[in-house]
């Protein structure tokens, strides 16, 4: 943000107010188009974010974004946060994401590659943290298999004449094969030692999720707790 190259960046208040203004303008354009061509659905062919590519979906996405932004400024600008939250949750403005099927995500259908998936599968750099292992396994969370893969075999830490790691014999003291295993934060042990630990299930073909109805329900609950609205 700023007026020209090299200018001082806008402060946070200016930036957030600009976000709300952008949402106002975007929704007005969509609503105007709906009125002029109610039976057209020209978004569908090029839409890589919503499930059906319909105008109502984009209105819901816009309102949900507005609610997210409102909650982010609620501790520093209560008046503006309350105003924007009420606007987002006003049913006359088109509603927000409510159903589990209403997911805003970048689809891989048009060649998009999930960058986290590349880092995870290509570099093996997205591992389960030991704290996450403790929570998920301690509470027997059924979502564990959705988040992480089970550990694979680990190998001895060997280096060839050129200083590169090479696979050696399977470590005999590693007994977590086929289990969920996280990495302890702050460890100074080399990467190869932890190479077999649980990695994320995200792949290069996994859609990149930007917003879900689950988040919006939490935002609505926060708005209600703050006394902004009856958030349902």
Role assignments for model-derived ranges:
Residues 1-232:
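Structured, solvent-exposed acidic/aromatic patches
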């Amino acid at each position: 943000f700023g007026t020209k190259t090299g200018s001082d960046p806008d402060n946070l208040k200016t930036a957030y107010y600009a976000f709300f203004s952008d949402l106002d303008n975007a929704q007005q354009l969509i609503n105007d188009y709906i009125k002029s061509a109610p039976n057209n659905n020209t978004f569908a062919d090029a839409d890589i974010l919503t499930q059906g590519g319909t105008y109502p979906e984009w209105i819901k996405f816009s309102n949900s974004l507005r609610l997210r932004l409102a909650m982010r400024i609620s501790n520093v600008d209560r008046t503006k946060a309350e105003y924007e939250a009420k606007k987002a949750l006003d049913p006359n403005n088109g509603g927000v994401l409510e159903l589990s099927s209403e997911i805003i995500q970048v689809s891989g259908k048009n060649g998009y590659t999930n960058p986290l998936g590349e880092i995870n599968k290509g570099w093996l750099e997205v591992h389960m943290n030991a704290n996450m292992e403790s929570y998920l396994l301690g509470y027997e969370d059924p979502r564990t298999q959705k988040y992480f893969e089970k550990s694979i075999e680990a190998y001895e830490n060997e280096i060839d004449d050129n200083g590169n790691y090479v696979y050696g014999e399977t470590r005999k003291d590693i007994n977590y094969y086929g289990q969920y295993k996280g990495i302890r934060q702050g460890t100074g042990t080399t990467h190869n030692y932890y190479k077999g630990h649980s990695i994320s299930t995200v792949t290069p073909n996994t859609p990149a999720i930007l917003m879900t109805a689950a988040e919006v329900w939490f935002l609505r609950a926060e708005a209600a707790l703050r006394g902004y609205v009856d958030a349902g």
